């Protein structure tokens, strides 16, 4: 069974309460339940973490080495400027998939840049909470394609 670390960045814990026109009505607990259901279907074990702190997110990324087979991360606002998170992603050997609930390329100009994406295996953006579902399926497809 593959093990995947899910990292929710700042303010993701407020999903369903803030900016519903951008992030939708689904709340944080419902997103996590959706992730757990899809992971079970795919025979993937998930550990779900959320942090509003850049340093804690970096520590979570570092902890994935030798403990997880992949990381799915929503860096949230850190996407646009955190070179430290980008460097942490580059420092681990496990594949990292970046996800976003909203389509960052359809939003404000300052949100159209992802400094973290360049070190990720891929990016899934704009599919609401299903961005996480698609990312879990991508992990499974990667596993199947490399025989691991």
From Swiss-Prot:
UniProtKB keywords: Amino-acid biosynthesis, Aromatic amino acid biosynthesis, Lyase
GO MF entry, a single one: 3-dehydroquinate dehydratase activity
Pfam families: DHquinase_II (PF01220)
Keyword Transcription belongs to the record: no
Classification via CDD domains: DHQase_II (cd00466)
Residues at the catalytic site: 23, 100
Enzyme Commission (EC) number: 4.2.1.10
This protein's record includes keyword Repressor: no
Residues annotated as site: Transition state stabilizer: 18
Disulfide bonds: none
Pathway info: Metabolic intermediate biosynthesis; chorismate biosynthesis; chorismate from D-erythrose 4-phosphate and phosphoenolpyruvate: step 3/7
Gene Ontology biological process: amino acid biosynthetic process; aromatic amino acid family biosynthetic process; chorismate biosynthetic process; quinate catabolic process
Quaternary structure annotation from Swiss-Prot or TrEMBL: Homododecamer.
UniProt xrefs under NCBIfam families: aroQ, PRK05395.1-2, PRK05395.1-3, PRK05395.1-4
Family: Belongs to the type-II 3-dehydroquinase family.
PANTHER family, per database record: CATABOLIC 3-DEHYDROQUINASE (PTHR21272:SF3)
Protein task: Catalyzes a trans-dehydration via an enolate intermediate.
Protein name: 3-dehydroquinate dehydratase
Organism in which the protein naturally occurs: Thermoanaerobacter pseudethanolicus (strain ATCC 33223 / 39E) (Clostridium thermohydrosulfuricum)
């Amino acid at each position: 069974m593959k093990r995947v670390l899910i990292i929710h960045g700042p303010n993701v814990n407020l999903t369903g309460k803030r900016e519903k026109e951008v992030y939708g009505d689904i709340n944080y607990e419902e997103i996590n339940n959706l992730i757990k259901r899809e992971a079970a279907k795919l025979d993937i074990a998930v550990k779900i973490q959320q942090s509003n702190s850049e340093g804690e997110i970096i520590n979570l990324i570092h902890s994935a080495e030798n403990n997880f087979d992949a990381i799915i991360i929503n860096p949230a606002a850190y996407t646009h400027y955190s070179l430290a998170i980008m460097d942490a992603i580059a420092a681990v050997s496990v594949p990292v998939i970046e996800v976003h609930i909203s389509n960052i390329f359809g939003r404000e100009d300052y949100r159209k840049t992802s400094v973290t994406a360049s070190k990720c295996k891929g990016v899934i953006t704009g599919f609401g909470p299903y961005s996480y579902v698609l990312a879990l399926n991508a992990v499974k497809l990667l596993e199947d394609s490399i025989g691991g």
